[in-house]
Swiss-Prot record:
Required for the first step of histidine biosynthesis. May allow the feedback regulation of ATP phosphoribosyltransferase activity by histidine. It comes from Ruminiclostridium cellulolyticum (strain ATCC 35319 / DSM 5812 / JCM 6584 / H10) (Clostridium cellulolyticum). It comes from the Bacteria. The keyword Metal-binding does not apply. This is ATP phosphoribosyltransferase regulatory subunit. CDD domains: HisRS-like_core (cd00773).
Length: 419
């Protein structure tokens, strides 16, 4: 036998009964939340051309993508994300559809990640995208949906941190940072590295006030009062407009009754080339990584030949499952209701009974006896099946209530009429 035949590659896993039930239940609740807002589901191909993800606007290093060739020598990838294909669809197949266009999706994506911290090379991504609306209302709706999605699966203790990349871009413009330093300082701010930010600022002759504002981005975050603190400063029009956008979004979220879940972090600057306005991330207690993230990305569709404002969010189902486990939230897989067992001579009647009970919305397994009824009892106990229906002949049936240790004789008609 080949050495690797019994293993799975790094970063992928088998999902067995209990975990798979939990995953499907979470997906069902998420899907229902998306539909309740009018975001209907689409599917995109698992395999895409490499070019779809190779634009400067996207943020997927080519070494993180799973690449291979088709029969014509063209480079293909297993999709590392679903937002980008949604942008492709909008610019091509839905080019003339009335806006805003509201999409939802749940599907597997593939990236070479550092395995650990809940990260996998294959994981299920769920999300929504709204294209064609540049308003604060659309940003707030997306954030509200993110909050209500987490609530729908049972999470209670979490925060959505809201940022706005245009605030920093306005400061960088005023300071005259080079493109190289904009990239470097934004990374330091996002990591809350005060010393790293100071090292870059020391290379520029900027006002004391502007310097202090930039430094505050590494440490001033939390309640909505952060907005007021930054508004006191003398900032340019671009940064002021960004602050006002955040204010309006927070005000709308108050109207949704969701302000308790919101905090502010204007130093959230992970994807400056991709994000064009509001950004946000979701965190919960005991989990050191975001369980969801979202942003406005108005430039993405332009790489496919159409200008279209856009906003959305996505989450990783496996990370959400980890967060829920740490929060003590469980989904118990329901057991089979009854085991219908029989000798082969009574097979037809057993199948008839099993099918009739299934039509009554019961979960029924069948079991062929070869070593007597104790064989069925042992099997039922191992699978936590509460009852056994033993078909002795066409109209002689013994019912075993294993949980309450009760045995009774019954008939075909009585059995079906009592369920």
């Amino acid at each position: 036998m080949s050495r690797w035949k019994i293993y799975t590659p790094d970063g992928v896993q088998d999902i067995l009964f209990d975990e798979c039930y939990k995953k499907r239940e979470i997906e069902k609740r998420i899907r229902n939340t998306f539909r309740s807002y009018g975001y209907y589901e689409i599917e995109t191909p698992t395999i895409e051309f490499f070019d779809v993800f190779s634009s400067e606007i996207e943020h997927f290093p080519q070494e993180s993508m799973v690449k291979f060739f088709d029969q014509k020598g063209r480079i293909l990838v297993l999709r590392p994300d679903i937002t980008v294909p949604v942008a492709r669809i909008t610019a091509t197949k839905n080019r003339d559809v009335q806006v805003p266009i509201k999409y939802s999706y749940i599907g597997n994506v593939f990236r070479f990640n550092e395995v650990g911290g809940g990260r996998q090379n294959e994981f299920t991504q769920a999300g929504v995208e709204m294209l064609g609306d540049s308003s604060s209302e659309s940003d707030a709706e997306i954030i509200a949906m993110a909050i209500n999605t987490l609530k729908s699966v049972g999470l209670k203790e979490f925060k959505i941190e809201i940022g706005q990349v245009e605030f920093f871009k306005g400061l960088a413009e005023e300071a005259g940072f080079s493109n190289e330093d904009i990239d470097a300082i934004s990374k330091q701010i996002d990591k809350k590295d005060l010393v790293g930010v100071e090292e870059i600022l020391n290379r520029y002759d900027i006002s004391t006030e502007l310097r202090e504002i930039v430094l505050k981005l590494t440490g001033l975050f939390g309640s909505v009062d952060v907005i007021k603190e930054f508004k006191k400063a003398s900032i340019n029009g671009r940064s002021l407009k960004a602050i006002e956008n955040v204010e309006e979004v927070v005000s709308i979220l108050c109207d949704y009754g969701l302000s308790e879940y919101v905090s502010i972090d204007l130093g959230m600057l992970k994807s400056l080339n991709y994000d064009t306005g509001i950004t946000f991330r979701g965190f919960t207690n005991g989990v050191g990584f975001p369980i969801l993230s979202g942003a406005r990305y108005d430039n993405l569709t332009s790489s496919f030949g159409k200008e279209c404002p856009a906003t959305g969010f996505s989450l990783r189902i496996n990370m959400l499952m980890t967060a829920m486990e740490k929060a003590g939230h469980t989904f118990e897989r329901p057991s089979v209701d009854s085991l219908v067992c029989y000798e082969k001579t009574n097979r037809k009647r057993a199948i008839e009974i099993a099918e009739a009970l299934r039509k009554q919305d019961m979960k029924i397994e069948t079991f062929v006896l070869t070593k007597g009824i104790d064989q069925a009892k042992k099997y039922a106990a191992s699978k936590k099946i509460g009852g056994i229906i033993y078909i002795r002949d066409n109209d002689k049936i013994t019912v075993y209530d294993i949980k309450n240790n009760i045995t009774e004789e019954t008939s075909f008609d009585t059995l079906l009429n009592n369920q």
